[in-house]
């Protein structure tokens, strides 16, 4: 059974998925788990694979969701993305990192394409 925070997180991922589909993305998979981390959503945006981190917050009482994408979190997402690319034989694929912020009781959605650079996250 999910607690309230987990339920809101799941609802946020569902809202993000609906939004991405409206934006023309094709969802490849959700909650891709690797030994080095998890990717919330992997989607195709035309010819580019997008590794999408979803941040869902009801309020900003714990700060802006943008601030929760720390360098450490970026490194984990990058490692998980590299694992996915290698595991699926797509090591040479064009890829980027997007963030979807789902916020408030109305689940307003903001998409940040190219939210961070994998090379900078590694440093």
UniProtKB/Swiss-Prot annotation:
Belongs to the UPF0102 family. It comes from Desulfosudis oleivorans (strain DSM 6200 / JCM 39069 / Hxd3) (Desulfococcus oleovorans). InterPro entries: Restrct_endonuc-II-like, tRNA_endonuc-like_dom_sf, UPF0102_YraN-like. HAMAP family: UPF0102. Signal peptide: none annotated. PANTHER family: UPF0102 PROTEIN YRAN. NCBIfam families: PRK12497.1-3, PRK12497.3-3, YraN family protein. Gene3D superfamilies: 3.40.1350.10. It holds the Pfam family UPF0102. GO terms for molecular function: nucleic acid binding. This is UPF0102 protein Dole_2298.
